[in-house]
Each structure stands twice: as structure tokens, then as C-alpha cells.
Amino acid sequence: LFSRIDSCTILDGSNLRVDGYDFAPSFSIWTTIEECLNPPVVWEDGRGWYTTTPFSELEIFDFPEGIGPVECVNVEHEEVVLIPQKIDAKKVNFKYGLGAEFITILKTINMLGMDRKETVEVQGVSVSPRDLLTASLPDPATLGERMRGKTCAGALIKGLDKQGNPKAVYIYNVVDNAWSMKEFGDQAVVWQTAINPVIALELIHNGTWKPRGVNGPEWFESKPYLDLLEEYGTSWHIRDEDTAGITK
């Protein structure tokens, strides 16, 4: 699709809501705190990997298939480390579509020190604030029946097409919670997260992917992966995006 990649931004967002809860994260709050409050890693050509402050580069991205606009910010995620090792891009970053409310909640958790892993003494009992917070919230694995909406993961690629013209696309997969619950009995975020290593293991087992040592999934041919994704009943799509700001 591209002769030059200016930027590769992984964008992950949803419009999921849980009936009966004002705040019930669809993924582990312990892990979410780790990813969102650690300094985000960004890659830039000529600079390499560097970190920024949490919640940097706020933008509103319009996610497809009815999810709509969501506030997205940089977070720490492994794709930023893996992609630049094999793919020539001027910039690589990862953004979560957390939404304004979730961003405010995470900032408050940090301000109150509830993100701390180190234990504190509470009436003679040693307690980790983050563990306490996690135990106080509903287990995401149990929320599927009450969850409504869709989740989306994809890559926003900007650069030049094969003819040297500005091009921007969002390559994505959307999972509807109603579908994943009906077909697999798993809520959408858990299913979309788990299907990736399942497909990777199949491709390694049947010899399509032949890794040696430690490898990132982004380093292998993508078509066999995308074909298997559809065999599991889901699909991937390419949406054209605004090319403003892309220069030849």
C-alpha cells in the first residue's frame, strides 16, 4: 500500500458500557494503570525510542462502525518497541481511546496514590493500594452479559502510496460484544485480545510462520494472519483517512 510510511499509530478504542455500573473497566484495572500511567514509549526516525509524559498527544479519533469519536492518548505498549525493528516508519506510537472520563479517573487514581504497588499499613494489615483498587472493582471477565457496544483495534498509517501520492488509511478489526458473547461466551475486549496469540500459535504450528528465538508477530507475513482472523468469524477492513499534512 505504501512506498513511504510517515507514521504508524496503533489506535485502540471502544464505546462499551456496562449495565448497572457507573465505572467498570472492560479490562484489568491493574494492567490499565500500568500501561497508562507509565511514561509512554514513542519511536521516531533519527531519535529512536523515547518516553513522554502520560496522556500525551491527546487527539479525538472517530472510530468506525458506530463507535464514534473517542479521546485518545499515548500509552506504553509493546508494538512501539517491535514495529520499528522490522518496518521502516518515521514515527510509531500507540494510543488508547480512553475517553475523557476514564482519563480523569486515572489521573485521580494517580493523584491519590492508589496506583502504587508498594504496600502500606492499614490497621496492622499490609495492603497494596493498587491491589485494593483492583479488588474493589468488578472482575472484567464476569461483565460480558451486562456489557453493550463494540471494541476496535487498528493501525492508522500515513505516508505516500506506490505512486508517490499522499495516502492515509486505518486498518482495523471491530468486535461486537453481543457477537463474541453469543459465539464464544467471552466479552469483546477479552476475546479480541486473546485471539491474536491463538492465531499466532496456529501459524507457528502449521509451519506458516517459522520464528527463531524471540520474535514479534508484526515481523511476519500478515496475510495468513488476516485470513485466519476471518475464519474465526470476525473481519478486518481498510478505511481511507484524511491526508492533510502529508507532504511528498
Q: Locations of the language-model features?
A:
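C-terminal catalytic/substrate-binding lobe primarily of soluble NAD(P)-dependent oxidoreductases
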Residues: F2-K248
